[in-house]
Amino acid sequence: MPRKGPAPKRPLVVDPVYGSPTVTQLVNRVLVDGKKSTAERIVYGALEGVRDKTQGDPATVLKRALDNVRPSLEVKSRRVGGTTYQVPVDVRPSRATALAMRWLVDYSRVRREKTMTERLMNEILDASNGLGAAVKRREDTHKMAESNKAFAHYRW
């Protein structure tokens, strides 16, 4: 444990195109091997595709998609007397957003469309409509927390 305490959160640079820190976070999530311009091209292309398909503001659609994917509960392992319990815990808002973005990007990577831009665009559209693998992951996480509610008293 460091004696100085936790490192302070650095301010996030606001996205130049949409003026949204959420889009910047998404670009950083898509980033592979430090190729930021490629990641920006993928994300901006996906958001342009969202604009074309919905005739609406892509930042709003992205926000709705993240709201549909963001978990409120998750399970953490807790060892008690030789047995490991899956204890349901509330998710901090910053972690919930990070998980939602991670799931959106991860499940868009395994989709079957040809380019990453198309895959990300379709996953965002599906998530904004309450469909898709990322939303299913959130439902599975909530179901796991619900089924282990009996162990909630082991919370720390």
From Swiss-Prot:
One GO CC annotation: small ribosomal subunit
Record keyword rRNA-binding present: yes
Species the sequence originates in: Beutenbergia cavernae (strain ATCC BAA-8 / DSM 12333 / CCUG 43141 / JCM 11478 / NBRC 16432 / NCIMB 13614 / HKI 0122)
Family in the record: Belongs to the universal ribosomal protein uS7 family.
GO molecular function annotation: rRNA binding; structural constituent of ribosome; tRNA binding
Lineage: Bacteria, Bacillati, Actinomycetota, Actinomycetes, Micrococcales
Domain of life: Bacteria
Role noted for this protein: One of the primary rRNA binding proteins, it binds directly to 16S rRNA where it nucleates assembly of the head domain of the 30S subunit. Is located at the subunit interface close to the decoding center, probably blocks exit of the E-site tRNA.
Name this polypeptide is given: Small ribosomal subunit protein uS7
InterPro entries found in the cross-reference section: Ribosomal_uS7, Ribosomal_uS7_bac/org-type, Ribosomal_uS7_CS, Ribosomal_uS7_dom, Ribosomal_uS7_dom_sf
Annotated keywords: Ribonucleoprotein, Ribosomal protein, RNA-binding, rRNA-binding, tRNA-binding
Pfam families registered for this protein in UniProt: Ribosomal_S7
Assembly information from the UniProt record: Part of the 30S ribosomal subunit. Contacts proteins S9 and S11.
Gene Ontology BP, a term: translation
